[in-house]
Amino acid sequence: KLNAFQISTGDLLREEISNNSDIGKSIINDMNDGKFVSDEIVNSLIKNVVFDSEKKNKLIFDGYPRSLSQAKNLDILLKDSDQKIDLIFFLNVNKETIMKRIEKRKIIENRSDDDTSTILKRYDTYMDTTKPVLEFYSKNPNFEEIDGSQEIDQITRKINNFLNV
């Protein structure tokens, strides 16, 4: 619908692991332990995407930025590549809903980083590091917070309305 590329940092990182790259080897334990991968590594992967001419002005980031450092890095990368952020939305989902959804995903995808203790660590880390990012972007007039604890079809409708698709 949008003629855009969804860029998931999780997918990029899992691809590095799958390819057995140097980056993949260095991050596998952190990811399996529910830790966030360093900003330096994530930013380098995002930089490659931002400067990909095929994707210019057609990017949708999923799971990035997750820290204030990453948000500031993204601003620099976009400026240096003559791009800008058009819209920002945050899916606000409570811990209980996240746990239920990941338990379902665990059955379907059988991901090694989807055990309960890892999920809880990731959630706590996410909440600690993401709050400053939300404060940073909430000042943007194109920022929208969407209740992510609703049914998926309701969330999809709200996102589509926000994106005008």
Across the structure, where does each feature detected by a protein language model lie?
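A glycine- and Lys/Arg-enriched "phosphate-lid" helix/loop adjacent to the NTP-binding pocket
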Residues: R14, I28-D30, N73-T129
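C-terminal alpha-helix
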Residues: K158-V165
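Small/polar loops that bind or transfer phosphate-bearing groups
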Residues: S38, D62-G63, F90-L91, D147-G148
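Residue-level signature of catalytic and energy-coupling elements of molecular machines
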Residues: G10, I46, I60, F89, ...
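A conserved segment at the C-terminal end of the G1
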Residues: K1-N3
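Loop/helix-junction capping segments adjacent to catalytic residues or to phosphate/diphosphate-binding pockets
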Residues: L68, E96, D153
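Small-molecule kinase domains that catalyze NTP-dependent phosphoryl transfer to phosphate-bearing small molecules
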Residues: I41, L45-V49, R111-I155
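ATP-dependent small-molecule kinase phosphotransfer cores
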Residues: F5-I76, D80, I108
